[in-house]
């Protein structure tokens, strides 16, 4: 199976599917259609019924081969790649039996070094796919696409493996936070689903951040600096003051585990106007709300000293902790745990310090935990994929389908 995984992943990563946060269309880039159309053809060649809408949401159905009712399970992956780094002319390199030493990435002068990326020590002896140092790899999330495709093909090639109805979904624009925005849960028509969009072997994630984006706009008063005393209000200084009043230790670079943070993503402006772009993250809903409240309080504390109330704060909730929707449905986690155990994989249920499409889908009525793909260092030239772990992920897809069928009961 490793050969087929390498061939399929190579085929997919060479297609540039980078999304664009500045676009107003869905998909945000036309080039995502290139992979979506290919996947539709490949699914149809496997005998699956497909359905792709005008927004690039490709759904397919593998019909049940049993004569009793079990839940319909879905498997999801996104086709777009991150806008954070070059995604064109991807030239994947294969490292056989990785020896644990630094890997020179093509002619780029970049080195994939286990001293810098210690998770590489977990894949010694594996076959790896890496970049040539000039682009990201796109294993996030084309590895997930491969694992679903290979899992479906395996089930078709082994009709003795019993399974219920399986729904497949390949979606656009996850990397820019819009993956579920046009996702039609009723059209997908699954009882629950799994995103194949994790990283290290064993990841089984059903806790995510609560997330919001915050725009702080500071309005100044521009006066000639030679006569500015008691008249000028410098918007840049207001922005600096605002940021200084947030807890300095509650930032991404000083937090881990369940610790939340404020993250200043961008700060631009001049004397007349300055804009600060933040994201807020916290696993705890109460603390999440307190973080938003704290930013409003800082605004008020500064504005009280000025006649024109110079600071505005706009908050937009992005997604919420999917544990709220998944934990009451214990079987959705128990199923992959049993599959992991059968494959000698130790489950790692640590919370995601981020979000997946499943974070939003779970609140849209489709509970969707996240499962490992075997890849790491996403969104940059040091991205890699372990073909060995990807093979295990394929067997997880197969195992979940089999486990649902073998349970002989409906979890609806």
Swiss-Prot record:
Gene Ontology BP annotations: peptide catabolic process; proteolysis
CC cofactor note: Binds 2 Zn(2+) ions per subunit.
Cofactors: Zn(2+)
GO molecular function terms listed in the Swiss-Prot or TrEMBL record: metallopeptidase activity; tripeptide aminopeptidase activity; zinc ion binding
PROSITE patterns referenced in this protein's UniProt entry, alphabetically: ARGE_DAPE_CPG2_1, ARGE_DAPE_CPG2_2
Active site: residue positions: 80, 174 (proton acceptor)
Broad enzyme group: hydrolase
Binding locations of Zn(2+) 1: 78, 140, 197
Binding site for Zn(2+) 2: 140, 175, 379
Catalytic activity field: Release of the N-terminal residue from a tripeptide
One Gene Ontology cellular component annotation held by this UniProt entry: cytosol
Enzyme Commission number(s) of this protein: 3.4.11.4
Main localization category: cytoplasm
Keywords linked to the UniProt accession: Aminopeptidase, Cytoplasm, Hydrolase, Metal-binding, Metalloprotease, Protease, Zinc
PANTHER family the record matches: PEPTIDASE T (PTHR42994:SF1)
General function of this protein: Cleaves the N-terminal amino acid of tripeptides.
Name the UniProt record assigns to this protein: Peptidase T
